[in-house]
């Protein structure tokens, strides 16, 4: 088991999660939701501390070979770590003060389970509601598939993309649209994003729905 390689991938995943939270931070600033903004700031501090520690631990890592067991471990750790970090804005903003409840909410999002501990999601701040909805969209295709589409981290045997796609993609099997798995990930995510945009536009134009509500609902619809 190439643990250092797996941990280095997790550090890249955390950096992607940091980027994914940026729109929510922008919404918090625009809406002047200071408690939510505080929650995101503390989360960023913890996230970058974790990334720094992971980079130190994996300083002399070697890519080596990447097999199915590494793919399964990477996928499992990604769900756990992303959910644990992703739930912190809810905790530190005090909108979902209990860590277990917030963790449940994010696991539900990133795994597209759809369950919730919230009785009325509309009572949440705009920024955290957006982050909650966005987690459903990210989990719909899988964050590791997104990583494949934008970053080159393949192992020596070229097995990284194949085993990650098999472990992360929905359905009993994953095939190639084009010869390279990386290109397949790009095409798949492009189609996924396009369908989400079309969904949101239909809700806005036909359903006469406010833009924010339409986008959040489109995230959840596309993810499931």
Language model feature labels by segment:
Residues 1-224:
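Membrane-proximal intracellular helices of multi-pass ion channels
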